[in-house]
Every structure is written in structure tokens, then in C-alpha cells.
Amino acid sequence: MNYLAAMLIASISGIRGTVGGQAGEGLSPSDVVQFASGYGAWILQKHHAPDRKPIVVVGRDARISGPWVRDIVCGTLNAQGIDVVDLGLSTTPTVELAVPGLNADGGLILTASHNPKQWNALKLLNDRGEFLSKDAGERVLALAKSTLTFADVDDTGTTTHDDSWLQKHVDHVLDLELVDPDAIRSAGLKVAVDAVNSSGGLAVPLLLKALNVEVVPVHCDPTGHFAHNPEPLPKHLVDLTDAVTAESCDLGISVDPDVDRLCFVSEDGSFFGEEYTLVAVADHVLAHTPGPTVSNLSSTRALREVSARHGCTYTAAAVGEVNVVAQMREVGAILGGEGNGGVIYPTSHAGRDALVGIGLFLTLLVSKGMTCSALRATYPDFSMVKDKMDLPPVDVDKALGVLQAEVKDAEVNDVDGVKFDLEHGWVHLRKSNTEPIIRIYAEGPSPEEAQALVDRFKGDLERHLASLEGPQA
């Protein structure tokens, strides 16, 4: 990962930054041109169809900066001789489906996911509609720093607009074998939806109305003026909780701005828990199609236990969707994802998809004939605490190694940072892929025990970091 500046971060998964300021210090128009052209050069190197220009699918969430970022991205790619299909307001999984659906060479998603409205980003997809591998991402970064040649005037590309893909995405979900539209339609559900005033305000109600669900909209106007911090955490979802109880809803649904994260609020206003979105979907999928499951190292133990209930194996992967997908392919997983509410169902496609998650979850809920809170009570109950600290200018990996050597009461996994599995819980410490921070996640039988693990290991890491000097490796 290359930190170009405090608020401009380039990594193998894309570039993100805050809008405004000088070039190289935030996400400026010149930075967008530089990175989009690096990606375009990579697309051109891979393209071998002499009868047509390369095609890239572009979609965006509703961020205020989205229109000008889109215009620059599309214009830059056109100037390189690449045709663009612009989906307009869209979702990350919608673009992922559209890339192979249009036989395109790649895709660009303009979204900073759960980051606040001042952030935006370019996320990069290959011709399968999946995030780039480490090698491909590094190649794009290298090309972005090089001197690039653009197309002659007669060879420039064009941009066409296609706003049909949200409906195609909904139709795709309804056609999945393990989604039962008729059962959901017959249940007469009432659901509150908080889409943080982004593109989920279009996509989620479109799916729910196709399932005969009465929708109570909460922040569903896709203006990009986020009504609260867009990360779907309990402290940010007070309006959704209030709507669920005030309107006597069967449940509430929250998605992040680009609709790849999904969490639920139960009918009594309690939080189902974003960690348990994947757990519940796994319960449904494994009951019908048993097979291996995968989640990342920072996800709840409950998935492992629910997998075991169905006689299935569980494997942990490094954090990051591309790592989870790679591990899923290695073990032949039937389902995977991340504990932040990201469901990856490869029967659909190899990417986190909140719409797919909604279809599978509602099918499970109506098939059980339970309330949302009663369903939650059927799963192992763990508590998670998520903390972080600023990334210091020292060798963090060395400090983690010292910490690893001194801990004797845990099983250790150092594939991605260091995870300590203890008898009654775990703690995972790692450098973030997207922000200049160290993430510290812990899980235990109770909130107090999880917090105690965070306090213990965070304190030990701070002690080791303070003893180090010199530049970060």
C-alpha cells in the first residue's frame, strides 16, 4: 500500500481520498485522470479483440462528487480508445454483474463505500467483474505513474448510458434457486429501509417491492447528502430503529452507500448484528446445499459454529474481498463473505452483494415462520468490539512480531496481521488496507470480555510501538 498523502490513498484495490485541496493531497481531478488512465492502459494491454474497442463498465453511488468524477473517468477512458458503458447511479454488485453481462473488459466503481461524504474512490474490476489481484493492482499503480499515450482522434472511444442494470440485478436475485419470491410475497412483510441517501435508496426498494414488501423509507433519497455516518453500525442507525418500532415493521434493513454491506434491525428494535448477516444466510444456504464456508479473520466465530451444525467445514481468509474470494475458490466454498455484513454467494457472483443477501435472508425468515429477533436467538451469541489506532511511523510488523512471540496462551494466525485465538475469544490486530490505521477487533462471550481483550492487546501493542524508532518498513 502506498500512502501518497494523509487523505489520498492508493492501493491495489483502487484509489480513495477526500475531495478538494491540492493535487496529490486529496482526490483532485488530476489524480482521477492519472489513476483512470493507468487502469485504462492496463485494460488496453489485456485487450486482444481486433474487431472492437475495449469496453469498461462505470457505475457510481450517490456521492456529491460522483458526477464530476464520473465525467473525468469516462472522458479519460474514451481518450485512450476505450468504450464506456455508464450505468449511472448504481451499486458495486450491480457493476460486478454488468461486466460479464456486457462481455466487458473491466469495470470502475466510483464509491468510497462506508467513508463519509467528503471521500470518493475508484474501485477496479477485471473482466469477470471481480476486484483485481495483487499483481494486477500493482501493475495499474505502476502504469499510473508512467507517461501514457492517448488515442488519435479517429480512434477515441464513446460513452453510452444504460440505466437498466438495477432492474436486471433485481431480476437476477429473484431467479436464484434459494430465493423464494412467492413465499416472501405471501408473507406480507413490512420493512423499513435506511439507504443513507445513496443508491441503495433506489435498489433496495426496487427489490422489496418486487417481493410485495411494504417499504418504509428512511433516508432513501439518493442525493449524496448522507443523513448520518454511512457505516451501518448501531450508533448510526437510530432513525432506522425508531422507524421499525414506530411503524410496527417486521424488520429494518440498512445498507452502505454502494450496497455491498447489509445489516438488519429486528422487529423489537434490537440489532440483529452485521456479523450475523452472513451467519443467517449461511444457515439457509447450507441447509439446502451443504459445503465449505469462508470468512475473513476479523469475522465472528458464529459462522464456524453454524457451519459445523450443518456438518460443513469453515476456513478463515485474510481481510479483503479479493482474499476471501481466492480462499473460497481454493476450498470450493458454497458461501463466504466478511463480518461487516458482506455476503458472497458464488452461485450468483463472486462479490459482496446486499441484494442477494436480502433475498436469501427473507426466504429464510419466512420459511422459519419466526420473528427476526427469534431467529437471531437461534445462533451462538458472541459480542465483538472494534477499535483502531493511528498508524505510527515505525515498523508495525516488527511490533506485532514481538507481541506474537510473548503471547503463550493462544493459537496464532499471522496471514494478515496477527490473530490470537484464545479459549473463550479472539483478538485480531492488523494494518488497514484502506486507511492509515491499525484495526483491533476482538470477540468474546460478552461485551465486557471482548473489551478486556482489546484493552489487553492494544496496550501491549502500544508499549511495543513506543519502543521502536525509524521509518516504517
State where each predicted segment sits.
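Phosphate-binding and adjacent anionic-ligand microenvironments
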Residues: 249-251, 289-473
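An N-terminal, well-structured beta->alpha segment
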Residues: 2-75, 79-80, 159-191
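N-terminal small/polar loop signature for handling phosphorylated ligands or for N-terminal nucleophile
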Residues: 41, 45-49, 54-119, 206-265
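Gly/Ser/Thr-enriched, mixed-charge loops and adjacent short helices
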Residues: 18, 120-247
